[in-house]
């Protein structure tokens, strides 16, 4: 079959499988790939290709992940699957694979297990917006009441973590039987694909979000004023737009009087572009690296937040020893390090390299942040952890 060319015209959605070890996440990933390729065209990936996940390094952390792509008539999906539990934890915290929605795989022979709960909690902490449930191995359960019981249990567990447990789609199927080509189970995979299409809304593109550019450098150009440079993270800035300088100091307002890229003057700077922004009436000393330029009112500076953190293992170049409460590392946000103190959850005395942990952080100066912002934890310029802002306090 001819390889379909990448369709730019279709909306692109990022999804992934989550759930307990051996509940069939990778088998389901292979089944989706096969059934959709068979039904709508495209390339099918085998279980072994997906299971043999290549190693990637994201911010110095080694993660094994498999990326596959598939299509429904209305959308193009990029799907990520991880072989090991630790890979999921790292993947979700570093945001190596941002998900617009997740497929929670639960074996109906087991029901929810410890990692099922942990993955749901992580999804909540890192801001995965939508979850669809695939109850797997239903061919091995003869008792309809038992299936109903497992479904209820999963729905309750999701509600416990503030997902709409009563309303989200639950599909009962068998990934293995679908992969073996049994029509009644293949139909369940198509039902899952239809649920992805209808339940996960089309993600807002970066360019449609409010303007934000982390400031990397500040220059003074005689006769013209102050230029800040950086890569536009989201949105568009146009000449004449009012912008705010947020973080580290008191927020100030100014106007963008010029945008340049590769020494050419432009009318606007867009998400993904590296540009220089000329600011009206701003002195060289009024701005510094680590602040952000943003659409007024779209982002605020904060100092205290709850985060979910993965602490690098010794093998990953992290610490060799645990840390305790009162630990004061640097927190690296976007372009700069800020010192902060940590508070560990009640009953937790120390954190070992390789652990993931929820912690409350208080920074010594405010940083422009939203929930979902990723950061690194560093000691003397060396990364020892990765985290995500889960909840802002102040």
From Swiss-Prot:
UniProt-listed NCBIfam families: EF-Tu, PRK00049.1, PRK12735.1, PRK12736.1, small_GTP
Higher taxonomy: Bacteria, Pseudomonadati, Pseudomonadota, Gammaproteobacteria, Alteromonadales
Gene name, Swiss-Prot/TrEMBL: tuf1
Positions contributing to Mg(2+) binding: 26
Primary location: cytoplasm
Keyword list, A-Z: Cytoplasm, Elongation factor, GTP-binding, Hydrolase, Magnesium, Metal-binding, Nucleotide-binding, Protein biosynthesis
Binding site for GTP: 19-26, 81-85, 136-139
Region (G5): 174-176
Organism from which the protein derives: Shewanella oneidensis (strain ATCC 700550 / JCM 31522 / CIP 106686 / LMG 19005 / NCIMB 14063 / MR-1)
Cytoplasm listed as a keyword: yes
Enzyme Commission numbers on file: 3.6.5.3
Pfam families cross-referenced by the UniProt entry: GTP_EFTU (PF00009), GTP_EFTU_D2 (PF03144), GTP_EFTU_D3 (PF03143)
Broad class of enzyme this protein falls into: hydrolase
Protein's name according to its UniProt entry: Elongation factor Tu 1
């Amino acid at each position: 079959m001819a390889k379909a060319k990448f369709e730019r015209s279709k909306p692109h959605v990022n999804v992934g499988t989550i759930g307990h070890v051996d509940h069939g996440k990778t088998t389901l990933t292979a089944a989706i790939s096969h059934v959709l390729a068979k039904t709508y065209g495209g390339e099918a990936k085998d279980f072994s290709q997906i299971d043999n996940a290549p190693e990637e390094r994201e911010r110095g952390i080694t993660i094994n992940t498999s990326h596959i792509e598939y299509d429904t008539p209305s959308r193009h999906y990029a799907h990520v699957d991880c072989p090991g539990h630790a890979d999921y934890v790292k993947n979700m915290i570093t945001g190596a694979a941002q998900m617009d929605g997740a497929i929670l795989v639960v074996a109906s022979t087991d029901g929810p297990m410890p990692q099922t709960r942990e993955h749901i909690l992580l999804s909540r902490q890192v801001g995965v917006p939508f979850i669809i449930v695939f109850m797997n191995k239903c061919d091995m359960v003869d008792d309809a009441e038992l299936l109903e019981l497992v479904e209820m249990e999963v729905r309750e567990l999701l509600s416990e973590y503030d997902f709409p447990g009563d309303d989200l789609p639950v599909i009962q199927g068998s990934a293995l039987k679908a992969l073996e080509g049994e029509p009644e189970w293949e139909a369940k995979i198509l039902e899952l694909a239809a649920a992805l299409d209808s339940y996960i809304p089309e993600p807002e593109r970066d360019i449609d979000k409010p303007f934000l550019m982390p400031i990397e450098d500040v220059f003074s150009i005689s006769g013209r004023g102050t230029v800040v440079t950086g890569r536009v993270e989201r949105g568009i800035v146009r000449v004449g737009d009012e912008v705010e300088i947020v973080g580290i100091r008191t927020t100030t307002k100014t106007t963008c009087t010029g945008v340049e890229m590769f020494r050419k003057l432009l009318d606007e700077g867009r998400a993904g572009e590296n540009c220089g922004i000329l600011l009206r009436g701003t002195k060289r000393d009024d701005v510094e690296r680590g602040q952000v330029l943003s659409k007024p009112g779209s982002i605020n500076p904060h100092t205290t937040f709850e985060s979910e953190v993965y602490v690098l293992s010794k093998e990953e170049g992290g610490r060799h020893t645990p840390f305790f409460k009162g630990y004061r590392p640097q927190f690296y946000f976007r372009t700069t390090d800020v010192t902060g103190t940590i508070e560990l959850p009640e009953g937790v005395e120390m954190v070992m390299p390789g652990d993931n942990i929820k912690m409350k952080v208080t920074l010594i100066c405010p940083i422009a942040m939203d929930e979902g912002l990723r950061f690194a934890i560093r000691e003397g310029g060396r990364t020892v952890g990765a985290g995500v802002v889960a909840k802002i306090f102040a």
